């Protein structure tokens, strides 16, 4: 009886440990760097900036929002979004966020989002290797 209880407790501990593991920054970068580089080539958004935003917005890929929506950048629905969405508590309860089938869809939409918004247009005049100017520019643009 004691052996069965011990084995059960060990099994529960192992299962809990496996499911409770979180993604590190390094793991996030390794997992998504190829998509970010591809998007940099396609759109001009620096891969370092894209990855940094993804890390911050998703807590390295561990946030509830990214797990239920593949939304790596916290992009909300707004009035023009007609695709799938999820409800998530953010600045206000039950806000509408875009939902993606894959992380790659989220990365592509992020690049397109920046390229098509007038208040981000000045960023594309910057050197794509100048991550500091891009970071300050994104902060300035809001």
Please identify what each model-predicted range represents.
Residues 18-142:
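Catalytic cores of secreted/periplasmic lytic hydrolases that degrade extracellular macromolecules
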Residues 1-24:
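Bacterial Sec-dependent N-terminal signal peptides
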